[in-house]
Amino acid sequence: MKRDRLGRFLSPGIARQRGGSGGGCGSGRTRGRPSRSGGTSADGAAAQLSWGSMTRSCGDTGDDGTDEAGAGRTLAMGHCRLCHGKFSSRSLRSISDRVPGETSERLSPGERVFIRDFQRLLGVAVHQDPALPQSVCKNCYTQFYQCHSLLRTFLQRVNVSPAGQRKPCTKVGVQPTTVAEEGACVADLIASSPRCLHGLVGWVHEHAVSCGSLPSLQRTLSSEYCGIIQAVWGCDQGHDFTMDTASSCRALFLDSALAVKWAWGKDLSPRLAQNSESNPTGAASRLCQARETQVGSETKTLPSVDVALLHSHGDSVGPGLGPCTQPHLAPSEAPGQLGETQVPSSTSDDRVKDEFSDLSEGDFLSEDESDKKQTPQSSDESFEPYPEKKVSGKKSEGREAKRPEEPKIRKKPGPKPGWKKKLRCEREELPTIYKCPYQGCTAVYRGADGMKKHIKEHHEEVRERPCPHPGCNKVFMIDRYLQRHVKLIHTEVRNYICDECGQTFKQRKHLLVHQMRHSGAKPLQCEVCGFQCRQRASLKYHMTKHKAETELDFACDQCGRRFEKAHNLNVHMSMVHPLTQAQDRALPLEAEPPPGPLSPSGTMEGQAVKPEPT
């Protein structure tokens, strides 16, 4: 705020009037000084009274040329795109701003960094819809980039062995790192070299000559160690090309892990050690040349071994690594069919697995890699022409002694998890059968509890249990049978209710059969004719129709039809021959069969003795 001559603060209206009196609106003088034209003091007082109205009507600007009329207004408000909270414009960051710390030299002016990073991290595209907020609050912005940096660190370390991390030696007077140590550091980087990309472009051009399909990235193959990634490019016709983004790094890492003495020249070794820090790519190419000379010497000493076989044993790398790898490539059968995969030698792979047995072996491998690993080695393949190049036994023993002892894991007391499943499997394989020990009883049970219950009910507590309901003369030998009888016959408790029609039942199985009528389900079916029904009693009665008539014991006197049970015959007589059955009942009692021979008791045979009325 502005001050007057005495140091007092002026009100906003007076400050704006005094600051803008020299503008193009009005002819007032500053500080109320009299005009040179001899204006009266009354005019000056009137001018002082009209300063506020003149400022509002004219819209004078301040000393800095900006409109100060809106200084007292509230700031613009907006919503956060992520948390949907309402914030002032000072607390919002545009989604098109750059990341803090990145300069314009690294990014183009129109690049939307927050949108790019959000999509890369979460895989969700940020839509540029005008109806959506175009800003995020500072809190969400800071939290997002904290998670962004943390996840990037995790992605770089998730497939890297802790033993492979080396601190770079950049101080003066310190011995420079060797090629193996530099390779271990380079192996942590997941990036492709220019030569690798050059090889990919060359394959695309050769592929376009013989095939019209456009190749694209099919999948990525992660190697077993160091987080090295292989990119597989291919087309719809089956042509593929495996681009090993860091095969030289893999070779260097294997050398450092296994301490293998390679046959390097006297002049080549010091140059590699000197240039390993300054140019890792050049060191890797020279290492490839050294391996090429070694393979050449091996082919000279072993003429019977195929060159391609030696290449498959060595660290065969992709065609995109420059001239040092070209001699290792076998000529393809047709252009565009470059399906080579980069596989380390089986012997070195086995040794690496021994060294790094604690690493996960669940990485995805290509079909060619799995076939090569599963194929057993022949006598020629397992022959090693340079046994003196191996590390001596003393050194290996010393290395094993220096290896830190792994902390012993204390086992928790008690049974190990999964012991119940083992017992269950043993029971299923060899079921235990319990037979009733009482003579004449053929009861058999799979569990001991069932056998104990059987012995208690049928052999130990054997007694008659009559029904307590008056008028019911039924007797039961087992207590639970009596309880079921009382519940079903002598009580009207119906706890099972149908949800659709409201009908009640005493037993659950009756409710299930009733619900089948609503659903129309008929789970039982006749194996002979395909008849379907809901209850087993219906199916059992239906199966009697398929029996031969000779097997049926009860025959009808009128029509000759035979039945399995007497009850079925009585039903047939009452339904089909009701008149005949009525006539039989109406026969006079006097019509008796002819008298037969008397029995010793004084009655005729077949005649029942009737009690005399009292």
Swiss-Prot record:
Signal peptide (UniProt feature, chain positions): none
Xref: Pfam families: zf-AD, zf-C2H2
ZAD domain mapped to chain residues: 78-164
C2H2-type zinc finger locations on the chain: 434-458, 465-490, 496-518, 524-546, 554-577
Biased composition (Acidic residues): 357-369
Entry keyword set: Centromere, Chromosome, DNA-binding, Kinetochore, Metal-binding, Nucleus, Repeat, Transcription, Transcription regulation, Zinc, Zinc-finger
SUPFAM superfamilies to which the protein is assigned, alphabetical: beta-beta-alpha zinc fingers
Function: May be involved in transcriptional regulation.
Protein name: Zinc finger protein 276
Gene source species: Mus musculus
